[in-house]
Amino acid sequence: MPGVYLEDSDNFEIALRRFKKQVEKAGVLSELKKRQHYEKPSVQRKKKKAAARKRLIKKMRKMSMG
């Protein structure tokens, strides 16, 4: 779990920025969005396959251009 410890000389804006970076790096917000609603395992598999297909198409397009 992300956390930032403040000292007396620390600026709040800087600490908030550090905290936001830690939250983003830990993936807290993306996990929260993913868990907002229940998703059936079959739907999860479909999304995972679609994402893999999309990555493959992107990779193939990049290879053909470069």
From Swiss-Prot:
Q: Which residues cross the membrane?
A: none
Please report the name of this protein according to its UniProt entry.
Small ribosomal subunit protein bS21
What taxonomic lineage is listed for the species of origin?
A: Bacteria, Pseudomonadati, Thermodesulfobacteriota, Desulfovibrionia, Desulfovibrionales
Query: Which Gene Ontology cellular component terms are annotated?
Result: ribonucleoprotein complex; ribosome
Recorded hits in HAMAP family, A to Z, give: Ribosomal_bS21
**PROSITE patterns documented for this protein:** RIBOSOMAL_S21
GO MF terms held by the record: structural constituent of ribosome
GO term, biological process aspect, one: translation
Q: Spell out the family assignment given in the record's similarity comment.
A: Belongs to the bacterial ribosomal protein bS21 family.
What are the record keywords, sorted?
Ribonucleoprotein, Ribosomal protein
Q: Which domain of life is it from?
A: Bacteria
InterPro entries tied to this protein = Ribosomal_bS21, Ribosomal_bS21_CS, Ribosomal_bS21_sf
- NCBIfam families recorded for this chain? S21p
Q: Which PANTHER family match?
A: MITOCHONDRIAL 28S RIBOSOMAL PROTEIN S21, SMALL RIBOSOMAL SUBUNIT PROTEIN BS21
